[in-house]
Regions:
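Enzyme catalytic cores with a strong preference for nitrogen-chemistry domains
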Residues: 1-181
């Protein structure tokens, strides 16, 4: 059975799951063919028990969320402020809400033949996240990212170089989708 995987970058969809479930279902309806075995993997924010996560959803063409992955390794001062609770008087940072870490990584199955390891943003730098999934017969590494905050620096190029290193290191194809190209 042929499966089509569409991949959007980290910040392509700014809704919050499950709060914006109807909007997420509309994404499936607008961008996936209901007569085909199509999937959309896209970045989003998720909220569970008053914790926010930098996440990615796998939607199918039947408007269902088939899987959700939440980021394990957060960017300090970008996604959380270290020691915020210990040093509250130094609370001069713009982001008032910290993202939470997931602490788990499981490959996402597209069908019975293909599984991929999802990585968000700079998680591609940490090979231990991939090592945890090697025994689960993964066929692909998918890295979605928003490199726009790097601006006109060498950052996006270095980030891309790490993705290439992971492909060589593990002998597994890496698909990297960035909102800046």
């Amino acid at each position: 059975l042929l499966s089509i995987l569409n991949i959007w970058p980290e910040t392509a969809f700014l809704g919050v799951y499950p709060r914006d479930k109807s909007v997420i279902q509309e994404l499936s309806q607008r961008f996936l063919n209901p007569n085909k075995n199509e999937f959309l993997f896209t970045g989003t924010i998720s909220n569970y028990e008053n914790n926010y996560y930098n996440s990615a959803l796998l939607l199918n063409s039947k408007k269902e969320v088939k899987n959700i992955y939440s980021k394990n390794i957060l960017v300090p001062f970008g996604e959380f402020v270290p020691f915020r609770k210990i040093l509250p008087r130094f609370d001069f940072f713009e982001n008032k809400i910290d993202f939470s870490s997931s602490y788990q990584i499981n490959p996402i199955a597209i069908n019975k033949y293909y599984k991929f390891v999802p990585l968000i943003c700079y998680e591609i730098l940490f090979s231990n996240l991939i090592f945890k999934s090697l025994d689960k017969e993964i066929s692909l590494i998918v890295n979605i990212t928003n490199d726009a905050w790097f601006g006109n620096t060498i950052g996006p190029i270095q980030h891309f170089q790490f993705a290439k290193i992971r492909a060589v290191e593990f002998g597994i194809p890496v698909i990297r989708v960035a909102n800046t190209g």
